[in-house]
Amino acid sequence: ALLDTGARADTPEQTTRRRDLIKLADRGEFKAVSPKLLPLLIHLDRLSDAMLVAEILAMADSVGKDAFLRQQNAIMRRADSRPGLSAIECPTLVVCGREDVLTPPDLSVEIAGLIPGAELVLVEDCGHLSTMECPEEINAALRNWMTC
C-alpha cells in the first residue's frame, strides 16, 4: 500500500521550501518547523483539533532534528520513479487524502494509473497525515484491500 505519496522528483519550488526549513532547523529553530508545516500536513478544518495538533507536534519532536534533516535531504535527492511503476506486479493500493497539499491527489491518481491493477482510494476531508486524521477510513480501505 502506498499512502499520501508521489512518484516524481521534487520540483525546484519544493526543494527551495525544504532548504528553507533545513536552514531554520540548522539555526536552532527546529521546534518552529512543525508549526510552519501544519497547514500542509493536515486538513485545514483539523488545525483547531488540539489533540491531533499536539500529537503531530510531539511526534515531530520525538523524531528529532537529525532525522528530519536526513528525510528532507533524501527527498530532495529522490529520483523520478514513474518509469518503473509499470513493472510492479503485486497487488497495490494507493491512498491519499483528497485535501492533501503536500502530495496532492493527482499524484496518487498518476501512480495508480501507472501500476497495473492498482486500486485508488481518495479519503474525503483529509490531508497528508491520513493515518492520523482519518484512521477509521484508512483502516477500512486497508482491510477491504487485504480481503479482496
What are these regions (language model features)?
Residues 1-7, 11:
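A conserved short beta-strand
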Residues 5, 75, 125:
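Active-site loop/turn elements of alpha/beta-hydrolase fold enzymes
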Residues 10-16, 28-87:
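Conserved alpha/beta-hydrolase catalytic His-Asp/Glu region
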Residues 88, 94-96, 100:
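Short beta-strand/loop motif that positions the catalytic acidic residue
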Residues 116-148:
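Catalytic active-site module of serine/aspartate enzymes centered on a nucleophile-bearing elbow/loop
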